[in-house]
């Protein structure tokens, strides 16, 4: 190789200074320090020199190569600093801009319905009472005149922990507990979660109910009809037709199912009401004397009515929701439709 280590270093220094990026810098490094680089080739010539020349020339090559590496590292650090400065400059934050407000959430539609129901009943003098979700056999069945042979006690309808401990199948046990601890007049609703061994397109193992009752002297079926009519017209915000159909519940006598004129088609008939023009919304009746006897209230002196409704069903009717599973899938596209604004 004809060039000296010093001239090679001078040439390499100019190329290092001219490199505009780390990639170009790496090309210069390979040109001088690679397997076929110029400093590498100079070291290969040492074998052709005499011992005195070899020592002197080897020192010069090593010094030039070390200096090149020092210049290379310094130039690399400078290029990296410049690149970082450019990136930071492009990402500059304008601290004078207004901050982003937090996205407002909304309540679940079932929660909205529960609040609406409790607000309407409170407005006519009902108190709201909650009770335990794990109940005993007495409060969930026996005190409500549901005998041991009743189908509701079967394993396929009820979640049992033991022979006498279970997940409540309705919120009516709250009615029993309230009547055990107090004397009439009593006017109470009991909202909450209930559980049944049932899971299909229209049923879930856990759902929400609101059960209510009114116990006092001379409470009649007319009071029941008037209370539920006022509630339903207030809930749906329209003067809808209401009808009572005879039915059977162990804890009420007489008992009735409550239907309203379909709020979807206004009674003309549609898929939701199965083209009948009517929708079943709740069950009700006059409290059975045996229920009063179980809690120590004189059925000769006092009378009362009770009712129960499914919160999910009323929610679906109020908001026009046709799939029960939407309540439990946590799909934000669905839930954000119920934001207050």
UniProtKB/Swiss-Prot annotation:
SUPFAM superfamilies: Class II aaRS and biotin synthetases, tRNA-binding arm. It catalyses: tRNA(Phe) + L-phenylalanine + ATP = L-phenylalanyl-tRNA(Phe) + AMP + diphosphate + H(+). Its EC number is 6.1.1.20. Mg(2+) binds at residue 253. Tetramer of two alpha and two beta subunits. PROSITE patterns: AA_TRNA_LIGASE_II. Belongs to the class-II aminoacyl-tRNA synthetase family. Phe-tRNA synthetase alpha subunit type 1 subfamily. Binds 2 magnesium ions per tetramer. HAMAP family: Phe_tRNA_synth_alpha1. It comes from the Bacteria. This is Phenylalanine--tRNA ligase alpha subunit. It is found in: Cytoplasm. Its cofactor is Mg(2+). GO terms for molecular function: ATP binding; magnesium ion binding; phenylalanine-tRNA ligase activity; tRNA binding. GO terms for biological process: phenylalanyl-tRNA aminoacylation. InterPro entries: aa-tRNA-synth_II (IPR006195), aa-tRNA-synth_II/BPL/LPL (IPR045864), Phe-tRNA-synth_IIc_asu (IPR004529), Phe-tRNA_ligase_II_N (IPR004188), Phe_tRNA_ligase_alpha1_bac (IPR022911), Phenylalanyl-tRNA_Synthase (IPR002319), tRNA-bd_arm (IPR010978). One of its GO terms (cellular component) is cytoplasm. Keywords: Aminoacyl-tRNA synthetase, ATP-binding, Cytoplasm, Ligase, Magnesium, Metal-binding, Nucleotide-binding, Protein biosynthesis.
């Amino acid at each position: 190789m004809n060039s000296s280590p010093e001239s090679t270093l001078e040439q390499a220094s100019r190329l290092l200074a001219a490199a505009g990026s780390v990639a170009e810098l790496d090309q210069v490094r390979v040109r001088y320090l690679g397997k076929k680089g110029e400093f590498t080739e100079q070291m290969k010539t040492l074998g052709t020199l005499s011992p005195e020349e070899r020592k002197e020339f080897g020192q010069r090559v090593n010094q030039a190569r070390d200096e090149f590496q020092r210049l290379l590292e310094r130039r690399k650090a400078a290029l990296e600093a410049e690149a970082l400065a450019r990136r930071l400059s492009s990402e500059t934050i304008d601290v004078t801009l207004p901050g982003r407000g937090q996205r407002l959430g909304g309540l679940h539609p079932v929660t909205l319905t529960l609040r609406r129901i409790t607000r309407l009943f409170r407005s006519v003098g009902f108190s709201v009472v909650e009770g335990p979700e794990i109940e005993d056999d007495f409060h969930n069945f026996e005190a409500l005149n549901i005998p041991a042979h009743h189908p509701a006690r079967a394993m396929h309808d009820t979640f049992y922990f033991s022979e006498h401990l279970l997940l409540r199948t309705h919120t009516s046990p709250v009615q029993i507990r309230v009547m055990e601890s107090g004397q009439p007049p009593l006017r109470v609703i009991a909202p909450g979660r209930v559980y049944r061994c049932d899971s299909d397109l229209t049923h879930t193992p856990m759902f929400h109910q609101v059960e209510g009752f009114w116990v006092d002297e001379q409470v009649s079926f007319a009071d029941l009809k008037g209370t539920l009519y006022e509630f339903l017209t207030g809930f749906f915000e329209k003067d809808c037709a209401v009808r009572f159909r005879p039915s059977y519940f162990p804890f009420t006598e007489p008992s009735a199912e409550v239907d309203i004129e379909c709020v979807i088609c206004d009674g003309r008939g549609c898929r939701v009401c199965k083209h009948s023009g009517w929708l079943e919304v709740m069950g009700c009746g006059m409290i059975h004397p045996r229920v009063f006897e179980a809690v120590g209230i004189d059925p000769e002196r006092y009378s009362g009515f009770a009712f129960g409704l499914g919160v999910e069903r009323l929610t679906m009717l109020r908001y026009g929701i046709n799939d029960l599973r939407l309540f439990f899938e946590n799909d934000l596209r669905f839930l954000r439709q119920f934001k207050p604004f």
